[in-house]
């Protein structure tokens, strides 16, 4: 999905334009996580909202969480899957339902490389987050 397609929904939800940052320099999710968490720490932000398609959201979350944990940051991550995306039509990146299998493969691959937080770390983080 394109940022230009999502932005009106974000603004209609009440998020001010000044609070929206479109990161478009990274080549992959890991680079987005490293850059995003670095930017958050530099600017003393306490919260990051991750907007991604449903099928990519879980891996994106685990990737950003890995970076938050590695930096020993107290940043709170929020998931916000993009809405109203069809599962069976080509969105420009392919058919989402067909891409789902690749996400599972990538989760396994990047977990083995240490790019993702573990399931246990995600659960512990979620417990901590709910106490904040």
What are these regions (language model features)?
Residues 1-95:
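A structural signal for short, hydrophobic/glycine-enriched beta-strand patches
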Residues 89-132:
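A structured, mid-to-C-terminal "fold-capping" secondary-structure block
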């Amino acid at each position: 999905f394109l940022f230009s397609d999502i932005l009106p929904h974000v603004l209609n939800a009440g998020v001010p334009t000044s609070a929206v940052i479109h990161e478009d320099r990274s080549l992959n999710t890991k680079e987005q996580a490293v850059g995003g968490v670095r930017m958050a720490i530099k600017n003393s932000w306490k919260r990051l909202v991750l907007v991604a398609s449903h099928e990519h959201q879980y891996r994106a979350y685990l990737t950003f969480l890995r970076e938050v944990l590695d930096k020993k940051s107290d940043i709170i991550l929020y998931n916000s899957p993009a809405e109203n995306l069809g599962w069976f039509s080509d969105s420009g990146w392919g058919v989402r339902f067909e891409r789902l299998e690749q996400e599972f493969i990538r989760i396994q691959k990047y977990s083995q490389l240490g790019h993702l937080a573990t399931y246990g770390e995600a659960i512990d983080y979620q417990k901590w987050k709910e106490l904040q």
